[in-house]
Amino acid sequence: MAPLRPIFTLALLLWVVLADQESCKDRCTEGFNANRKCQCDELCSYYQSCCADYAAECKPQVTRGDVFTMPEDEYGPYDYIEQTKDNASVHAQPESPTVGQEPTLSPDLQTEGGAEPTHEVPLEPEMETLRPEGEDLQAGTTELGTSASPAEEELCSGKPFDAFTDLKNGSLFAFRGQYCYELDETAVRPGYPKLIQDVWGIEGPIDAAFTRINCQGKTYLFKGSQYWRFEDGILDPDYPRNISEGFSGIPDNVDAAFALPAHSYSGRERVYFFKGDKYWEYQFQQQPSQEECEGSSLSAVFEHFAMLHRDSWEDIFKLLFWGRPSGGARQPQFISRDWHGVPGKVDAAMAGRIYISGLTPSPSAKKQKSRRRSRKRYRSRYGRGRSQNSRRLSRSISRLWFSSEEVSLGPYNYEDYETSWLKPATSEPIQSVYFFSGDKYYRVNLRTQRVDTVNPPYPRSIAQYWLGCPAPGGQ
């Protein structure tokens, strides 16, 4: 019997190891659980925290409702009447934020919780209640009681913009002079422009803005030698701060900025700053953990990016969102050398949504009643309470996520479309970057760093494609 002893011992050790490993069995809908050694929630692929049997037990899939198939400024066939009936203006609702520790910019800049009360800014996109599109405010009025007269700020004037940025709830904001605009899928939302002072608590104009693409989704505004940081519309304690302290190596009075996500939780987020004919690349030291973000609403922009990690695009994400071993700022480079086709000086910049190329559906026999821009905004599937019990989108919510060319496909079961339709061999994620200069803008493919070749060509009119103004010579 002696020879059996080693076999028995080995079997016992194997049992101990297997017992120590947690499983996703019956856990696929429980969400993030800080008390577990491994996770089974929908974001575990990004955080590299999934249990070993996550794929087998939970069968993670990228569905049609998780992706865009067109960039923001393109057009597609669209049944306007049906969309208007089903559509609603959905904005993420804020919770009382519990601010997690911000990624380290430098050792002496840690935010001390409770050091001083936060300055509440009535950031309208985070604070508004749900209402159908047809029930928007009357044009020229605002929820804050401030109305900008056309003499003060003419929407279609062609004046250059100072900044564009997506907020964590997917709302798109544009800044020009003393005013800011919130943009919907085709134009400016009713009630805008509003004074930057009334919405953000900062006197305009500002120089640049960006929103980090991580679970916290904090927004940064830059003006002169200082910057402000907001979470859920509330100014973080001890702000504003000097750019030289928080972003060492980045100059004051920047012209533009945009942020990119890390390729995964082990990677680093990047921000590009532009001033004059040069640009700087800055890399954050670290990003917040999933546990640190549990007390606040999840960034819808980050959620959309993290969902794409379910599929086989790891190598592409590493190529697009690579990171250097060390953080901080790199030496400045010339814009004209690295961003081909972009003017030598830009006024504003913004990272576009990630869309999947090669997924254009077959035309429907259904009559196409209209063509409309496809600037669908991000929609959080978790909603206000971040409930993860429902793993699939309803038909109505799925419609809000689809690009405009998908909405006219006719009747089908929206919940039956899984990864069989999405083949990485024939499609891949595309990250666009928008550069705004004067009254025109350019769309650049991040991977090639070249202006896209499309028809109509770039540069295109900001007023026409982003503000809903008539085309030059139009009515």
UniProtKB/Swiss-Prot annotation:
Positions of modified residues (Phosphoserine): 312, 394
Domain of life, per lineage: Eukaryota
Motif Cell attachment site mapped to chain: 64-66
UniProt-listed PROSITE patterns: HEMOPEXIN, HEMOPEXIN_2, SMB_1, SMB_2
PTMs per UniProt: Sulfated on tyrosine residues.
Listed SMART domains: HX (SM00120), SO (SM00201)
Modified residues (Phosphothreonine): 69
Basic residues composition bias: residue spans: 366-384
InterPro entries found in the cross-reference section: Heme_transport/Cell_adhesion, Hemopexin-like_dom, Hemopexin-like_dom_sf, Hemopexin-like_repeat, Hemopexin_CS, SMB_chordata, Somatomedin_B-like_dom_sf, Somatomedin_B_dom
Composition bias, Polar residues: 95-109
Disulfide bonds: 24-28, 24-40, 28-58, 38-40, 38-51, 44-50, 51-58
GO cellular component entries: extracellular space
Signal sequence extent: 1-19
Pfam families, A to Z: Hemopexin, Somatomedin_B
Residues annotated as glycosylated: 87, 169, 242
Subcellular location: Secreted, Extracellular space
One Gene Ontology molecular-function label: extracellular matrix binding
Subunit description: Interacts with SERPINE1/PAI1 and C1QBP. Monomer.
Domain remark in the UniProt entry: The SMB domain mediates interaction with SERPINE1/PAI1.
Protein name: Vitronectin
Name of the coding gene: VTN
